[in-house]
């Protein structure tokens, strides 16, 4: 079975640039990769797959989960958590969109008092 690659430092820096602005968000090593949490709730998890593709998972509004699944690659629905969606990361990743998705994930997982401190991106 192929090894899962470590998440490159440059990729971690890009994700940190987004999540480090969230109140009380903490980073920790996960069983594979790295995850970010608000208290005990995971808001994002980035990891390398056995296929050598890097992915990030996050939380989405329940109504949006089916839409992401329907879009297909680079999005995918996970087998755990009813509101967990994933995105395959590559050179074509839209980091502005990912910033919006991670912001939404934080706001879904954080207590209202903390979520209200975060400016959510405006949708045109």
State where each predicted segment sits:
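Charge-dense, helix-prone N-terminal extensions
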Residues: 1-124
